Amino acid sequence: MLCNIFKRSLQANIRNVNNLNVLRLSSSSGPRGEIQDALDIEANLFGNSDLRHEPMNTREALRKNRFAGRKPKVPFASVASRNLSAPSNPAPRVAPTPAPVIKDNELNLEFVRLTLQDPLTSTLLTTVRSRKRRDKNRQIIVEGRRLIQEALQCGLKMEVLLFSQKDQLALVKEEVGVAQVETGTKIYKVPQHDLKTWSSLVTPPGLMAIFDRPSDKGLEKNLAEQQRLGSQPFPITVVCDNIREPNNLGSIIRTCAALPCSQVVVTHGCCDPWESKALRGGCGGQFRVPIRDDVTWDELALTIPPEAADDCHVFIAETNQRKRENNQTIDYADIKGLGAHNLLIIGGESHGVSEEAYRFLNLVGGKGKCIYIPLAAGIDSLNVASALTLLLFELRRKLIHQASEKE
């Protein structure tokens, strides 16, 4: 290809030289102006030509021929800056119009009517339905008039109240009115079908509230109030193991609050004690007794009060007949000698007590016992909450008797 280029260039130059020779021969007797013009053409022949006789290798000649006629590439930075540059006339963003606040003179409350298109609706829905969001914000969802009143009575802070019908709001107007003035509770009216979708209950009560979880300060205040009324917590910690049913866990917490126990420990693998069904099963017990949830067996020893760590007794309530045969068990009525603090481990009806619980029992040596409730022939077990009620009040009776003997 390079030879062809040089060949064509040489042929063109030869033709131009021949033309000049003809001009010289014909102009020997011609006028002076024509001869000068021919000489100027000869002098500038290669200077004005588009062809250049430049040293060039084959690779460079092929590259020039391949990319001849193409547009030069635009650097990436210039393209990016051009594409990412702001438009000359950006469209202004229209901020959503906030819903008007409705002042109800009859209830003496202020609320906002939410629609499905309101951005706040999706935010509230995420908070209600997402356990991860609730755990991060340490919030709980409370449904129903009685449970909301119980939470307010125990000093919990109500962030949001949702209602669908005005007559339902009227049932709690006094307590909610105080909360709105003191803590700035926000009240929203939503359609009944939306509230039914958000609720985890089959029959929604029409009232749903978002509360902050009980704080240590609030529990200490409730404890001081119980002591003032003559109700001192007993040195008993109930440890829930493999409790998978929310209603059963709620009933267990309710019994512990009724005794009352020092605290309730919910081990890893149990259901959520702050789930809506567990709260309804607890009937407000979660607001009155300290609860430590999602505790591993390695962390269980840290829940024992430091002042009673040297004299802590551990009891396992075993309902499985086969496990009772493999371990030395005693009748719960034959328990003798309780410690400065006592751990009662109770398992679920389906899975029973785990092997981790027995390994923890072996750590305390002679201060650990496996107990059972004798039942009639043909009856395999009791409901876990019913069994716990029998055991706790028997331990309470023995603690009272033990204290009276020391006096």
From Swiss-Prot:
UniProt cross-references to SMART domains, sorted A to Z: SpoU_sub_bind (SM00967)
Q: Which residues form a coiled coil?
A: none
Which UniProt keywords are given for this protein, alphabetically ordered? Methyltransferase, Mitochondrion, rRNA processing, S-adenosyl-L-methionine, Transferase, Transit peptide
- Which terms in the Gene Ontology molecular function aspect does this entry carry? RNA binding; rRNA (guanosine-2'-O-)-methyltransferase activity; rRNA (uridine-2'-O-)-methyltransferase activity
Give the primary localization class: mitochondrion
Mention any one GO cellular component term assigned to this protein in its UniProt record: mitochondrial matrix
For the ligand (S-adenosyl-L-methionine), the binding residues are 347, 373, 382
Which Gene3D superfamilies does the record associate with it?
A: 3.30.1330.30, 3.40.1280.10
Transit peptide per record: 1-25
- Entry function: S-adenosyl-L-methionine-dependent 2'-O-ribose methyltransferase that catalyzes the formation of 2'-O-methylguanosine at position 1580 (Gm1580) in the mitochondrial large subunit ribosomal RNA (mtLSU rRNA), a conserved modification in the peptidyl transferase domain of the mtLSU rRNA. Also required for formation of 2'-O-methyluridine at position 1579 (Um1579) mediated by MRM2.
Family per similarity comment: Belongs to the class IV-like SAM-binding methyltransferase superfamily. RNA methyltransferase TrmH family.
This protein's name: rRNA methyltransferase 3, mitochondrial
- UniProt source species: Drosophila melanogaster
Lineage summary? Eukaryota, Metazoa, Ecdysozoa, Arthropoda, Hexapoda
